[in-house]
Amino acid sequence: MESLPAAEVLLSGRSDRLDDDLLGRLAEHPLDSIETEYPHHVGAVDGPENPERPSDRHPVFYGCFDWHSAVHSHWALVRQLRLVEDHPDREAIVDSIEARLTETNVDRECERFDEDPTFEKAYGWAWLLHLAAELDRWDDARADAWRATLSPLEDTIVDLVHTEFLTDERPFRVGTHGNTAFALHCVFDYAQSVGDRSLETAAGETATALYADDADYPIGYEPLGWDFLSPALTEADLMRRVYDPDEFAAWLDGFLSGVAEPPVDLPIEPLSIGEDPEDGVALHYVGLNLARAWSLAGVADALEDHPAVPALEATAGRHATAGLEQAFTDDYAGAHWLSSFALYLLTRNEGGIGCR
C-alpha cells in the first residue's frame, strides 16, 4: 500500500478524504472473505453427525472464519457502497450479497437463534444491528430491498437484545468479543440511527446502571491477553454517547483520573507486533490500535474544550497510523476482519457511528 495520509486525515472520519488506493484495500479482503467458507470456527459440536457445512448452517454469513466477522464484513461492503457512489468494486459487491441474501437463507439464519438464543451474544448481535442500520441510512432502492429481506433476522436480534442483553446485571470488562460496552454502544447507535427511542432509552439506562459509578480505571494495565478492544476506552466511548458533554467530562475525570488536569497522563502507546507476526492472535493488537484510535478520537470530539483534548488527539493519531500500517495484511488470521475495523475508524463521522 502507498504511504498513509497524515494523522489529521485519518482521524477526520470522512470518506471523501481517502484516496483510491486506501478505498480499494478496504474492499479487497471483505469481498474475498465473505465467500471463503473454510477455515471456519465451530464453537460446539452436538453429535457425530455434526457439524453441518457452514454454508448450510449459515447460508448468508458463512464466510470470514466466523459468523460475526461475516456480518461485519457485509456491513463494511454496504457502507462503502453507500459512501462511495462510484466504487470500483460496486458490481462485484452487489452480485456477491444478492447471491446469498434471500428470504430462504435469512429464515435459516433465524432458525439458528431459535436453536440457541445465546449464539453470538452480544458481539455478533451488535454488528448485525450495525448492518441493518447501514441499510436504513442508505437512500437506495436496492438497500430498501436488502433491509426488507434481512428484517426477520434484525427483528430477532432486537428482541434478544431486549430480553437477553439489556437485562445483564454485570458488565464483561474484557478486550475481546464479550465486551459489554462495545455491544452496548452498537445497540445505542442502531437505536438512534433507525429512530427506536424505546431501545435507545433502554440501552442508555443499562449503560448508566453498569458504568456510572466507575472510577480510577487502571488503563496502564492494558492490554490483557490478546485484546482487540480497550476495556477502558471502549467504556468511555460508550458513555460519551449516553451523557451530555458536561456530564461526560465530569465522569471521565473520575474514570481516567490522569486526564483530569494537565499535564495529561495517559499511559498507553501503540502496540507493535513486528512486520511479519507468526502468531495470528498477535494480529488482535492491530485491531486494538485501530479501536483505541476511534475511541480516543470520539472521546476527544465529545470533550470539546477539555484540557485533555490535544493529548487524546495526538495519541489517537499515533494509534491510527500504527494500526492502518498493518491492517491490510494478507494473513487470513487478520484479513478476515481487520478491514472492517479500519473502515470503522476512517468513516466514523459518516453517520451511524456515535450519532446523535
Model-identified regions with their sequence ranges:
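Haloarchaeal acidic low-complexity proteome signature biased toward cell-envelope/secretome components but also
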Residues: 1-21, 93-108, 268-271, 307-314, ...
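Low-complexity, Ser/Thr/Pro/Gly-enriched N-terminal "stalk/linker" regions
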Residues: 1-62, 331
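Well-ordered alpha-helical scaffold segments within catalytic/enzyme domains
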Residues: 5-18, 74-87, 126-142, 183-195, ...
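Solvent-exposed loop and edge beta-strand segments that line ligand/cofactor-binding
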Residues: 15, 54-71, 110-126, 167-181, ...
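Long, well-ordered core segments of solenoidal/helical folds
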Residues: 26-39, 51, 92-111, 149-170, ...
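Extended ligand-binding groove/face enriched in aromatic
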Residues: 59, 63-71, 83-194
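Active-site-proximal alpha-helical scaffolds that flank and shape metal-associated catalytic sites
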Residues: 121-125, 174-187, 209, 215-261
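Fungal-biased detection of long, low-complexity, Ser/Thr-
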Residues: 272-356
